[in-house]
């Protein structure tokens, strides 16, 4: 009898897992347009966290830095090092862009694990990390594409497009395809990792609600930070490559 009850409980848990929805969305109707409300709400929360924390720390800088000031200075120095390593000596103007990408993605990824999005009920779907949605990651990747095209054209003018026929014009289609695959690889890598992490946690919580999901959540926090670093580093590398030439 006990074996039968355990079997039934296991089936019930798998039934609960099957009810987990990935594609449900909540939209706002603005005129003739449907706006993806989930992504906007969570993105605004992440932006608010970044703005408020920055204002609180830097509005009154101290001669002897506070712990918060030390942290922000360390983050800025870290972003400068990444930008300089990937872009070169002309990295200065690109530090704000690379830093914004890194901080937004980092806080977005961590918000999926640390913020209780589930307590906010929506008519359809549920709130999650902004980077859990392909719309966000594609938008970030397209911004990166615009940035490295701008970097190359602003430095070399129309001669920038000469890279597409180097080292031989036969490679023109491949070189063009490469520029299209860069944003795709950036967006799908980030989206896939964050979505997979959240789904694994949901499944484990459904099966074993107590202790087992905790190590996975800590691993998710670590990989979320790594994904933010990878995205920012690759964005800086693409910008540096467009300014230096085709490699």
UniProtKB/Swiss-Prot annotation:
InterPro entries in UniProt: ATP_syn_F0_a_bact/chloroplast, ATP_synth_F0_asu, ATP_synth_F0_asu_AS, F0_ATP_A_sf
Gene Ontology MF terms: proton-transporting ATP synthase activity, rotational mechanism
Residues that span the membrane, as ranges: 38-58, 95-115, 134-154, 199-219, 220-240
UniProt-annotated location(s): Plastid, Chloroplast thylakoid membrane
CDD domains linked to this entry: ATP-synt_Fo_a_6
Source organism, top-level taxon: Eukaryota
Membrane topology summary: Multi-pass membrane protein
Gene Ontology CC terms, in alphabetical order: chloroplast thylakoid membrane; plasma membrane; proton-transporting ATP synthase complex
Main location: plastid
Protein's UniProt keywords contain Ion transport: yes
Transport found in the keyword field: yes
Keywords: ATP synthesis, CF(0), Chloroplast, Hydrogen ion transport, Ion transport, Membrane, Plastid, Thylakoid, Transmembrane, Transmembrane helix, Transport
Record text on subunit structure and interactions: F-type ATPases have 2 components, CF(1) - the catalytic core - and CF(0) - the membrane proton channel. CF(1) has five subunits: alpha(3), beta(3), gamma(1), delta(1), epsilon(1). CF(0) has four main subunits: a, b, b' and c.
Function in brief: Key component of the proton channel; it plays a direct role in the translocation of protons across the membrane.
Classification via NCBIfam families: ATP_synt_6_or_A
Entry similarity comment: Belongs to the ATPase A chain family.
Name under which the protein is recorded: ATP synthase subunit a, chloroplastic
Lineage start: Eukaryota, Viridiplantae, Streptophyta, Embryophyta, Tracheophyta
């Amino acid at each position: 009898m006990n074996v039968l009850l355990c079997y039934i409980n296991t089936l019930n848990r798998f039934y609960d897992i099957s009810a987990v929805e990935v594609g449900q969305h909540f939209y706002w109707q603005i005129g003739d347009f449907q706006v993806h409300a989930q992504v906007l709400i969570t993105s605004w929360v992440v932006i608010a966290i970044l703005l408020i924390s920055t204002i609180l720390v830097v509005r009154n800088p101290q001669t002897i830095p506070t712990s918060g000031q030390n942290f922000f200075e360390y983050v800025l120095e870290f972003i400068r090092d990444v930008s300089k390593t990937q872009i070169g000596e002309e990295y200065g103007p690109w530090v704000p862009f690379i830093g914004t990408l890194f901080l937004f993605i980092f806080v977005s990824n961590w918000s999926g694990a640390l913020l209780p999005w589930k307590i906010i009920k929506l008519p359809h779907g549920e709130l999650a990390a902004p980077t859990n949605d392909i719309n966000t990651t594609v938008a970030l990747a397209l911004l990166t594409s615009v940035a490295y095209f701008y970097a190359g054209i602003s430095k070399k003018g129309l001669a920038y497009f000469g890279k597409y026929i180097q080292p031989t014009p036969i490679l023109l289609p491949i070189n063009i395809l490469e520029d299209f695959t860069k944003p795709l690889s950036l967006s799908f890598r980030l989206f896939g990792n964050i979505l997979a992490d959240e789904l694994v946690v949901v499944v484990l919580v459904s099966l074993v609600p107590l202790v087992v999901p905790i190590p996975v959540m800590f691993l998710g926090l670590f990989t979320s930070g790594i994904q933010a670093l990878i995205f920012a580093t690759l964005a800086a590398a693409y910008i540096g490559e467009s300014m230096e030439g085709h490699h």
